[in-house]
From Swiss-Prot:
Keywords: ATP-binding, Cell cycle, Cell division, Cell shape, Cell wall biogenesis/degradation, Cytoplasm, Ligase, Nucleotide-binding, Peptidoglycan synthesis. Gene3D superfamilies: Mur ligase, C-terminal domain, Mur-like, catalytic domain, NAD(P)-binding Rossmann-like Domain. One of its GO terms (cellular component) is cytoplasm. Cell wall formation. The gene is murC. This is UDP-N-acetylmuramate--L-alanine ligase. It comes from Corynebacterium jeikeium (strain K411).
Length: 498
């Protein structure tokens, strides 16, 4: 950790973009620890209202005067560099006043300092796996602190300042900022090219995960998914380097299905999913914890029945990672397994919104081709029993990602029966001439019907006109598409009333 971070004064923290999922969680923990918090954002939100109720001073809109919301100038300003432009008047004013401007990850690194850090990294699955780990540790009688990119359904929050010694958090690789952390347990769920607007090359993206692994504290664990080629390759390279005379101060272990573990024999498997069965209550798996866990948990080795309520093998893999990491931290394995069984999900991760006219409506945050494919495969498991179809309402996120992965998005969306494509949600990016969602649609398999509806206000009525009893509608994407799930239900209500 840099000398600047070591000496950072957190007594008065001003957060630019305080309403975001990651920023609001850090604000909540800072408030719980007794620091003064102020901030600003472009629009009102439930997160902002909750933070105000907890004592934060927050202004909607950005202006230099916001720096004085708490009555005096802040000791530090925090922002998300990816989301907030550097000419923001509050950032400019802070620099002119000599106030340190830090990233969210820098502040999280400070909050992690006196805790045992259990960090979840990977291209996909961070939020779900982090949330499962929290549920597991809470069920084991611990009170972990946590900072998550989504809101836990049961807890109704995305962050908590716990009394226990463990801090569970997502480690976001999108701008390399997770290199600020020093975890005891680091899980890597998968590594696939993403965020190429920042990293430029696939090799640079993969290399940042190797650097992250070397941030693990001596005696800690790197836990990798062996069903994913990218994370398995990371483990294999580290182990090979150790065998060639570059010893590692941490232990590398894997988790995955029996097939995944068998495919990478050089990586010692610590958690093996030996069988799975889809039931009305969810997916039930036989999870074997091997002798590898005895390095940290002498009594935990054995085979357990693991129930995961949320559909999809990707969720079973996430659950296995959460179990393994929790057990390596010393949590009681039986209580951990029970905690996973009671986990009921995270907002915007295969989140059920309702049923109208025998049409189920779900919402999911998936915005990378692999995530889209995983959620549609999970939906297929559920919809087959109903005899209906999958109607995917997809809003691509970022022009750069749409251009880089148009083929892969088309392949993933071809798993649906009907696709409704919205205009691209550009977020921080400017529109690119000639690039819209049709570059995906034109490559979707001929067996899947698709329509392009650029008028956001018309999408819910378009969807209502396409669905049939027994169908499942999934609104998918990281942008404003989430607003449509309830709108579609209302549109179906209107149709039901005639």
């Amino acid at each position: 950790m840099s000398d600047q971070l070591q000496t950072t004064d957190l007594s008065r923290v001003h957060m630019v973009g305080i309403g975001g999922a990651g920023m609001s969680g850090i604000a909540r923990i800072l408030l719980d620890r007794g620091y003064q918090v102020s901030g600003s954002d472009m629009k009102e939100s439930r997160s902002i209202m909750a933070l105000r109720a907890a004592g934060a001073q927050i202004q909607v809109g950005h202006a230099e005067d916001n720096l004085r919301l708490s009555g005096e100038m802040p000791t530090v300003v925090v922002t998300s560099f990816a989301a907030i432009p550097q000419d923001n008047p509050e950032l400019v004013g802070a620099r002119e006043a000599g106030i340190p401007v830090l990233r969210r990850s820098d502040i999280l690194a400070l909050l992690l300092q006196d805790r045992r850090a259990f960090l979840l990294a990977g291209t996909h699955g961070k939020t779900s796996t982090t949330s499962m780990a929290v549920a597991a540790l809470q069920a084991a009688g611990q009170d972990p602190s946590f900072a998550i990119g989504g809101q836990l359904n049961r807890a109704g929050t995305n962050a908590h300042n716990g009394t226990g010694e463990v801090f569970v958090a997502e480690a976001d690789e999108s701008d390399g900022s997770f290199l600020s952390y020093s975890p005891e347990i680091a899980v890597v769920t998968n590594i696939e090219p993403d965020h190429l607007d920042y990293f430029k090359t696939e090799s640079a993206y993969r290399e940042v995960f190797e650097k992250f692994a070397h941030r693990i504290v001596p005696g800690g664990f790197l836990v990798v998914c062996l069903d994913d080629p990218g994370s398995a390759a990371l483990a294999e390279e580290l182990i090979a380097g150790a065998e060639e005379g570059n010893p590692l101060p941490f232990t590398v272990v894997g988790y995955g299905t029996a097939e995944g573990c068998d495919a990478h024999p050089s990586v010692p498997p610590a958690a093996i999913i030996e069988s799975t069965e889809v039931t009305a209550e969810g997916t039930v798996s036989a999870l074997r914890l091997t002798e590898e866990v005895k390095k940290a948990a002498e009594e935990a080795a054995g085979t357990y029945s693991l129930r995961v309520a949320i559909p999809g093998i990707h969720m079973v893999l996430n659950a296995a990672a959460a179990v393994l990491g929790s057990v390596l931290l010393g949590a009681d394995v039986d209580k951990v397994i029970a905690g996973i069984g009671g986990f009921d999900g995270v907002r915007r991760r295969f989140e059920y919104h309702g049923t109208r006219q025998d049409v189920e409506v779900y919402d999911d945050y998936a915005h990378h081709p692999t995530e889209v494919a995983a959620v549609l495969a999970a939906a297929r498991q559920r919809v087959e029993a109903r005899g209906g179809r999958i109607v995917a309402v997809f809003q691509p996120h970022l022009y750069s990602r749409t251009m880089n992965f148009a083929d892969e998005f088309a392949e993933a969306l071809s798993l649906a029966d009907q696709v409704v494509l919205l205009d691209i949600f550009g977020a921080r990016e400017e529109p690119v001439e000639g690039v819209d969602s049709r570059i995906i649609g034109n490559k979707i398999d001929a067996s899947t019907d698709w329509v392009f509806e650029p008028d956001f206000s018309k999408v819910s009525s378009v969807v209502a006109g396409l669905v049939q009893p027994g169908d499942m509608v999934l609104t998918i994407g990281a942008g404003t598409v989430t607003m449509l799930a309830d709108e579609i239900l209302l549109e179906l209500d209107r149709g039901d009333r005639g």
